[in-house]
Amino acid sequence: MSTSQLAKKGEAWSARFSEPMSDLVKRYTASVFFDKRLALFDIQGSLAHAAMLAKQGIIAEADRAEIERGMAQIKAEIEAGGFEWKLDLEDVHLNIEARLTALVGDAGKRLHTGRSRNDQVATDIRLWLRSEIDNIMVLLGALRAALLDLAEQNADTILPGFTHLQVAQPVTFGHHLLAYNEMFTRDAERMADCRKRVNRLPLGAAALAGTSYPIDREFVAQQLGFDGVCRNSLDAVSDRDFAIEFCAAAALVMTHVSRFSEELVLWMSPRVGFIDIADRFCTGSSIMPQKKNPDVPELARGKTGRVNGHLIGLLTLMKGQPLAYNKDNQEDKEPLFDTVDTVVDTLRIFADMVPGITVKPEAMRAAALQGYATATDLADYLVKKGLPFRDAHEAVAHAVRACDSRQCDLADLSVAELREVSGLGDKAALIGDDVHAVLTLEGSVAARDHIGGTAPAQVRAAIAEARKTLNG
């Protein structure tokens, strides 16, 4: 087979070889059926590159105009779903270039002057990922807003706070929800910080060493909205640390969603019954008619494992690669794409689901009345009366053990009984008639009246501050 015949096979590099690539290898190495989602960003980058080439006198202005005309038609075909993607053309870049050349002739062949697919794909990914980060930050904002609204509605609602899944102290449900707002706020900050490193232009690095053409990289960066250019051509084409950093931030987003999901599943359980989730976010059973299953939070837990796996996959992908570009890097896209899709879908669903959560304050309060949730308040009461904390801790532990045997709560004991079971001896008189005020749930949460505390007034203040941050 002649080299001219090989060139007709479609590979941009086929003139170098004496036999065509096997069909199996074509399928194995092709990326077009997943990287075609970069198409509009590929066009965007190519238009900026063409404008720079014309500005620098590397191609004629007439060629640039033809390239723009052809790209406009290709974009319309892609958006209409009429673009024909060909496996023989390997990837998104060569498919678009081949179509451009078919439309505008030699002008299309001149577009690739001064660049390589190595810096081209790195640019496409950064353009695409920058756009997706912006979208994720909007979705994080929507979820945070929904959590703040639900927290405000429940600033006075009391439920048991847990450590080790054992009743610890009373907290307000609003305070509990604000904890997740803090997590998602940090997630948004991490995304914004990650975006800074994504927003650097690789184009101009060419294959690995730069190009001999008199290009203007800063012009292209400005055209594409990048903050600047990648400063080393080898690094620009070969590293994917920006994608790894994004996946790490995304894994934390999903980890926080997963923690919230676990609590939603627990709270919705009939044995707990703190909340109900709207029917449109649940499924039933094909055999058990009574079932209402919290599939959305359960799936979010499961999908978190997949996103975490993508992070490890990308780290493993990069760990053994020498400089510069290697074909291994083609494997960066599918995990990155799936990570974005999973995070976007999850955040969109949760932002819609949270406002529809039905809170059951009576069930929460009943649970908070079990497990001696105000035991720490009794110890603090004794400390304020002058008892050392360790002695107070021991006295309350004696009282709790007595309540266990009597099957009652601390608040059910009279002052005389509290004195008797405390083991304080002549110091038992420190327990006065005012003791029961600190053993109420309302008294307990109201006492934590400081920044970061669970008191309703602090919860409302924290919500107001969080909204300023969100809207600022």
Swiss-Prot record:
UniProt key word Lyase: yes
Known EC number: 4.3.2.1
Catalysed conversion reaction: 2-(N(omega)-L-arginino)succinate = fumarate + L-arginine
Pfam families, alphabetized: ASL_C2 (PF14698), Lyase_1 (PF00206)
InterPro entries associated with the record: Arg_succ_lyase_C (IPR029419), Argininosuccinate_lyase (IPR009049), Fumarase/histidase_N (IPR024083), Fumarate_lyase_CS (IPR020557), Fumarate_lyase_fam (IPR000362), Fumarate_lyase_N (IPR022761), L-Aspartase-like (IPR008948)
Top-level EC class: lyase
GO cellular component terms, A-Z: cytosol
Subcellular location: Cytoplasm
Keyword Iron-sulfur part of the UniProt annotation: no
Keyword terms, alphabetized: Amino-acid biosynthesis, Arginine biosynthesis, Cytoplasm, Lyase
Source species, domain of life: Bacteria
One function term, GO molecular function aspect: argininosuccinate lyase activity
Example GO BP: arginine biosynthetic process via ornithine
UniProt family annotation: Belongs to the lyase 1 family. Argininosuccinate lyase subfamily.
Protein name: Argininosuccinate lyase
Lineage of the species this protein comes from: Bacteria, Pseudomonadati, Pseudomonadota, Betaproteobacteria, Burkholderiales
Gene: argH
